[in-house]
Amino acid sequence: MILNVNTEIFEEFLGDYTGFFTGSFIAKKKKLNQKTTSNYLQDLEKKGILKSKTQGKNKNYFLNLENKEIVKNFILAIEHLRTIEFYEKNLVIKEISEKIKEHIKGSALIFGSYAKGTQKKDSDLDIFIIGGCNENEIEKISNLYNIEINLKVYSKFKKDILTKEAIKNHIFIKNAEQIIEEILNDNY
């Protein structure tokens, strides 16, 4: 297992780049030790990845968007680890992802039940694409594996409900850096 407690703590920020989170909220949600969580958040703040604001008794942490290059690279590293972990648990989806990447121009991520880890045997595979793709070739791959692939294709990044849903729970499969930069630049 590549992911560790520190990765779990930081994952909360990956679904909402403008979110504010307390250590106690993250610890409770992830079922982690409060002190461990607090120490790691403080460490990320010292490294310039997070900032904090105290409101009452609560210390709210958020991404340090004034330090975009460091934050982007840290997010990218964590996202790559999450993708590896996902592929270790979902070998068939890894194969499908490898095959469909050839037919995607731009960026792509998995969202929906597979990204949340709630998929069932008959779940479809939701793919969010910014750019373009060869839908006919992807449909052939879908038929080959007998898994319905549901494509959501945007020619360019745009803020809407679907984008927000895809960002909230996702696994990057192609050009993660491009989407991360779009999100960071739009403060989304």
What feature does the model see in each segment?
Residues F111-S113:
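Glycine-rich beta-strand-to-loop/alpha-helix junction loops that act as flexible
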